Each structure stands twice: as structure tokens, then as C-alpha cells.
Amino acid sequence: MKKSTLALVVMGVVASASVHAAEVYNKNGNKLDVYGKVKAMHYISDDDTKDGDQTYVRFGFKGETQINDQLTGYGRWEAEFAGNKAESDSSQKTRLAFAGLKLKDFGSLDYGRNLGALYDVEAWTDMFPEFGGDSSAQTDNFMTKRASGLATYRNTDFFGAIDGLDMTLQYQGKNENRDAKKQNGDGFGTSLTYDFGGTDFAVSGAYTNSDRTNAQNLLARAQGQKAEAWATGLKYDANDIYLAAMYSETRNMTPISGGFANKAQNFEVVAQYQFDFGLRPSLGYVQSKGKDNEGIGDEDLVKYIDVGATYYFNKNMSAFVDYKINQIDDDNKLGVSSDDIVAVGMTYQF
């Protein structure tokens, strides 16, 4: 049976948050697209720090300029504005801000606030309607997710020689003038992704290694000089089915109460199916376990089953529900919340 037009559109939207960005200018080799979304959302939970309105707006632009037939300049900026705060509160944050150059088959090089190399793997399981992707990927946590001071080189199809083999090389400069858990020393990262020449199956791997700061080594937990991580992932995306799994390990990197975990073992898996009429149910599992932590030994940092669904009215409008079934023990020695959360809401995106 032929897929409906709606199903094809939805699969495109899921594949890229900005796939249907609005083109506002395209002339003489210069192009500018804008994109964004309004997520009107409410959390229901016994955890008072989570329960309540979670509405926010995201907005961004992507631009490029054709310098010559080989060289293209580009830039991207994205911000988020909280919709659940008083007007007097400062609630804006910059998610992405980078610019760079792309030289045809030789790849692209950019600098700024960007996604870390480890997230090239972790993104495959960060697909739940609301939750997910939080075992090892955290904002401003070395190169696990969005971070500042990143110089990033990306190459697709390995210089045009191997279809489907993509490579990332990344360097992160020192960031110290912030909370110790958000700091980082100089570091590097790399990732490889291969889809076997355009098949529906792909594998990926990533590695990062960074210096830790003096302030981080003064914290009670994890005093190693280096923060290190590796990750590997598998993905299948075809026939309306999406399946992905990720395993990673971090050392002296994952934040916990009192500092960082000496070691964390992280696992995520997600399964989704796209119905022709717009419904996309989702089932997943996320776990992060801290190992050999000072004073407490091994303890779960994140552990939950996720059951959710998104209904796409069209490419711009959707409604969702996401149930985070927490598996953390009530007597968790790190004080991690053990309460369930249900997220319900609607999203308008362009």
C-alpha cells in the first residue's frame, strides 16, 4: 500500500526539526531560512520542581552565502524563550550560534556554540515526544551535547570516496567562568557514522577527551585530571519503523550530587512506528548508572521506561503525550527524584 502524503511529511519532520524552515531570502548566491516552534506543554508529577507549566518557544535562522563554485560560507543561530515565567524574569538562552566555511567535497569547518561530537551518536535515541536522550548527553557538559567554544570539522561521504561514511573532528577551548559542573578544560572529540552506502541501517561511534578544571577537582566526587567518554550506536529507519540503541561510558564527566561520577555506564533504546494517518507511538528505556562513587559506591543516576505518542495533524501542528515511568529507588543515595512525570501538550512548528 502506498504511504499517505501525511506519513511522508511526518517522517521528514521527525528526521529534522528544521526540515520545513521558511525561506525568507534566496538571491545572488545568498540564502536565509528561519525556523521555530511553540511547544505548549504541562507536566503532571508529584515532584514539585517539575510539576506545572513547561511552555517554551524556540526560534532560529540558517544562512549561507556562495563565495565561489567551491566555497560556501554559512551560519546558524537558535534561541529558546521560556513561556512559563513572569515577564520580569530573564528566561532567554542561546542554544546554537556558529559560523563557518564549507569547501565542496573537503568538508566544513565552523566555530561557536554547537553540538558536541558525542551527540552524533546520542541523537539517535533522543527521539521521545518530550523526554529521553539524558543518560549521558547534557547541555554544557564537555562535548556530550550543546556546548560553547567548539571548533568543528565535518566531512560527509569521506571526501566523496566512500558513500555514507561521515566523520567529525572537534576541539573545545577552555570554559571556566561558570558553575564548576558546567566548566571544561581544553579537549578534543571525534565521531564516525556509516550507513553502508545509503542503506536503512547505520552504525556510529564517538570518543571525547578533555582536561578538567581546578574548580572541578576541588569538588567532593571525582578528582581525575581528565574527563573521557566513548559511545556507540545502531539505527534502523525504514518502512515506517524507527529503531535505535546507544551505549556509552563516561569517566569523571557525568554530573552528580557533590561533583561527578567516577564512571557512568549509559544505555538508551527507542522504538517508534509511523502510521499513515499521523499517529506515531513511541516506547523506550533510558539508564545511567554511576560506578564507584565516593561514599556511596554504585547508584542509578537515571532509570526510566518511556511510553508516549505524537499525533501529527500536518507538518506544522502536532499533539503529544509522554509518560516517564521512573525506576529510581526511593532511597537513592544521591537524592535523584523517583517520581513519575506525564507530559502533555501541543506543538506548532515552521
Swiss-Prot record:
Annotated signal peptide: 1-21
Biological process terms in GO annotation: monoatomic ion transmembrane transport
Protein origin, superkingdom: Bacteria
Subcellular location: Cell outer membrane
Keywords: Cell outer membrane, Ion transport, Membrane, Porin, Signal, Stress response, Transmembrane, Transmembrane beta strand, Transport
InterPro entries tied to this protein: Gram-neg_bact_OMP, Gram_neg_porin_domain, Porin_dom_sf, Porin_gammaproteobac, Porin_Gram-ve, Porin_Gram-ve_CS
Family affiliation: Belongs to the Gram-negative porin family.
Function description: Uptake of inorganic phosphate, phosphorylated compounds, and some other negatively charged solutes.
This protein's name: Outer membrane porin PhoE
Gene: phoE
